[in-house]
């Protein structure tokens, strides 16, 4: 891919609004309280380091973008979720991946789950109750009834991969 596209006429026409070197966009969420506030999970290029990897935020409807979470030039963001009961709270999952001739590195020690309580200004890596070591792709969800219940579907080693639930984040 070549970035984020936006339509203001119900999909009749589209305009590229940035993140052209992200190549792989995993998710886009729009703040329900302010539709100009957009979060984009960018995985980055598969075949090389760099590109626009990380979690990006636009406060002006896509006119400008700021990277608000970045781990490394080989690790992108595979998911981002916003607490529907408190839009200040975000969770994001990181995914370290690279394709080389004949192999795909689909996970590594930089994979994990991060939490922000200030709309992405600061982040804390969550570790309690989660697997360590090489982590692959992670899918996230927050319970709409109980915001402190967070679900994660984690690809990892055979003994640690699986469906995780926390009731205290």
Where do the protein language model's features map onto the residues?
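Beta-propeller blade termini and top-face loops
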Residues: 1-169
């Amino acid at each position: 891919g070549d970035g984020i596209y936006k339509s203001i006429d119900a999909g009749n026409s589209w305009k590229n609004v940035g993140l052209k070197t992200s190549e792989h966009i995993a998710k886009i969420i729009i703040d329900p309280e302010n539709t100009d506030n957009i979060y984009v999970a960018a995985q980055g290029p598969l075949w090389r380091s760099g590109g626009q990897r990380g979690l990006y935020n636009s406060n002006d409807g896509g006119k400008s973008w700021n990277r608000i979470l970045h781990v490394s030039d080989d690790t992108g963001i595979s998911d981002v979720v916003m607490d529907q009961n408190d839009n200040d709270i975000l969770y994001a999952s990181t995914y370290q991946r690279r394709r080389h001739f004949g192999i795909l590195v689909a996970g590594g020690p930089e994979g994990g789950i991060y939490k922000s309580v200030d709309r992405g200004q600061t982040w804390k890596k969550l570790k309690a109750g989660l697997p360590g070591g090489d982590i692959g792709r992670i899918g996230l969800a927050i319970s709409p009834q109980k915001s402190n219940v967070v679900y994660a579907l984690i690809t990892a080693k055979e003994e640690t991969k699986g469906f995780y639930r926390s009731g205290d984040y």
